[in-house]
Regions:
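Bacterial Sec-dependent N-terminal signal peptides
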Residues: 1-23
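Aromatic-lined carbohydrate-recognition surfaces of secreted/lumenal glycan-active proteins
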Residues: 25-33, 81-85, 153-157, 192-241, ...
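The substrate-binding groove and active-site-proximal loops of carbohydrate-active enzymes
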Residues: 49-61, 117-135, 187-205, 230-232, ...
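Active-site-adjacent "subsite" loops/lids of carbohydrate-active enzymes
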Residues: 82, 86-147, 181-199, 207
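Glycine-rich, aromatic-flanked loop segments that form ligand/cofactor-binding clefts
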Residues: 65-119, 151-161, 213, 217-228
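Catalytic domains of carbohydrate-active enzymes, especially glycoside hydrolases
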Residues: 27-61, 65-68, 142-151, 252-257, ...
């Protein structure tokens, strides 16, 4: 998750969907890239997720506009989808005051030590304020829909458990609870209250952005579908990240998910029979299964992420072995 979006992400996604969904949506494979069409990345999936209005923070090329990147794939017969982060992304124009004349780097997630948690250079994990959500809707969602894209993926609604000390979080606390902020490390009750607010903030963020996307799309005669790419709750508990994932079934604006399971999540060591070690296949099986269970009562669409590499540098034998393990777990 933390560095998996390289210059070009060639992770192909296979989908498990109900029979009724298949009659409405024939997209079964898709992949993400922040780049324009190139022969080297044309893998003939059903669709492509063009990443970011401004690209991906890790992609330093940024030679073509979003509209030109969309056009290059559409000319090759691809169905075009859009993907960006809701907790981090290429949003420097917001943080540096180009959006409303005010700097917003103070809206990052901050630890007890006073350190901002960064996803990359000038890319903090965000406390999603109402102002930030307005920016996302006006600067990103509108532009994407204006370009004719009718499927939006807002990935990784994540609030780190160790965060919760920024001024922006304290303001959200006061608005939500009606009393002053309390440091989460001082009591179990404070920890609960802090986590509850973190959960709510990204639940609200997805609801507001997706509801806006659907309404704006409808005004232009489009039926916009909205998806949440997210890690499993198995992984979030291991990495100590708060996510509203368990409540997404209650949001009518959510049409489906991507199960972000790959070697990086599944090789996290865990305990069995008193022994702590990597169990990539077993963990991946639990991760995919826990996410597939989210669709049982709703019939929503679920894509399974499959990625041949991971965040950290390993040798290719290691990549291959664990890629095969996660793929088999599907």
């Amino acid at each position: 998750m933390k560095q998996k979006h390289f210059l070009i992400s060639l992770a192909v996604l296979a989908t498990g969907i109900s029979v009724s969904a298949q009659t409405k949506d024939n997209v079964k494979t898709t992949f993400q890239t922040s780049r324009e069409w190139k022969p080297s990345i044309d893998n003939r999936a059903d669709a492509v997720m063009v990443y970011g209005v401004g690209g991906n923070p890790s992609d330093k090329s940024r030679k073509l506009s979003f509209e030109d990147r969309v056009k290059s794939w559409k000319e090759r017969g691809y169905i075009i989808h859009f993907m960006t982060g809701i907790a981090w992304g290429e949003y420097q124009d917001y943080f540096t005051g180009q959006w409303d004349g005010k700097w917003h780097l103070d809206e990052g997630q901050v630890t007890q030590a006073g350190d901002t948690i960064w996803h990359g250079h000038m890319v903090p994990y965000i406390v999603p304020s109402e102002n930030f959500l307005s920016y996302l809707k006006e600067r990103h969602v509108k532009r994407v829909i204006d370009a004719g894209v009718d499927a939006i993926f807002m990935e990784e609604p994540e609030f780190w458990a160790r965060a919760g000390y920024s001024e922006s979080f304290k303001k959200e606390w006061k608005k939500y609870y009606g009393f002053d902020w309390r440091p989460q490390h001082e009591s179990p009750e404070n920890t609960y209250l802090s986590s509850k607010l973190k959960y709510y903030l990204y639940y609200r963020a997805l609801n507001e952005v997706f509801t806006f996307a659907k309404e704006y799309g409808k005004s232009k005669g489009m039926d916009v579908k909205c998806y949440v790419p997210t890690h499993s709750l198995v992984n979030y508990s291991q990495w100590q990240i708060v996510s509203p994932e368990a409540s997404l079934a209650s949001l009518p604006c959510v049409d489906g998910y991507i199960a972000q399971v790959w070697t990086g999540t599944s090789r996290e060591p865990n305990f069995f029979d008193g022994r702590k070690r990597e169990r990539v296949f077993e963990t991946a099986y639990l991760e995919y299964g826990s996410m597939e269970s989210m669709t049982a009562p709703t019939g929503r669409k679920m894509f399974f992420l499959t990625d041949p590499i991971e965040d950290w540098p390993r040798d290719w034998a290691d990549y291959k072995k664990n890629y095969q393990a996660t793929f088999t777990a599907q």
